[in-house]
Amino acid sequence: MPFAKGARIEIENQTDVNIGAFYYYIDYVEMKELPKDMGRFHAWFNREITEALPEGETEWGSVGKQTENKDGADNYVFADIKGKGHFVGLNYYVQCPTPMWYGEGDDMWFIDGEKQASLIGTGTEDLFNTAWCPKEPYQHIYFGYPRVNNDVGFLGRTHVYRFFIQDPVFFEKGLKATIEHGHNNCLTLDLATVAYWYQDKATAVPTIPDKAGRKLKPMVNNVMMHKWRHEWRKNKGNKADLWGNE
């Protein structure tokens, strides 16, 4: 985290609990001057409860025909940068309220004001160097799945990360980095991200949500799912032998 004139790091307790002790240490190196091309480190937290399509959560064609995402206008935005720099990392947190796979969403990178993305991925897990709907914890220096939920399908909370140290995304004028929430943004998800990049100069980042805006949605559990089944049974006339695939 290079700095030329000074740096300030603040830690704020936004919980309702008093912290009796707080331990930390900071290492830094003093230099007479920085290299001329040394960028400035930036990080930005974003969160959104995404909205499903009007026709429903049609992932994998399970409840309706899948449609095409032609422009990425409704994608989740994890970086919206103005200026020159290079993108170096992403922490991605997803809470999925359905057992359906959350990761068919493609990443789309709009570089230097592009109207159409020049970098388009093939799925959320592919962006994080994995494949085939991973459900096992795995951690590497540059990518990993430190948290997964193996209760019921993909219901629950998952955390993945990737650092683009060996393959940064460069931009001259700006970068808008986005990802679909499900195929063509068909899923309601609780998404949160922290993006990391370097710019040629220190630049203010977009305002992050306040404490209330960062509060997670409650977990959907097996009891809630059974209540959904109960309502489905009532809609089917409460026949005694209803199974679930009628």
Per-segment meaning from a language model:
Residues M1-E246:
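Beta-strand-centric surfaces of beta-sandwich/beta-rich domains
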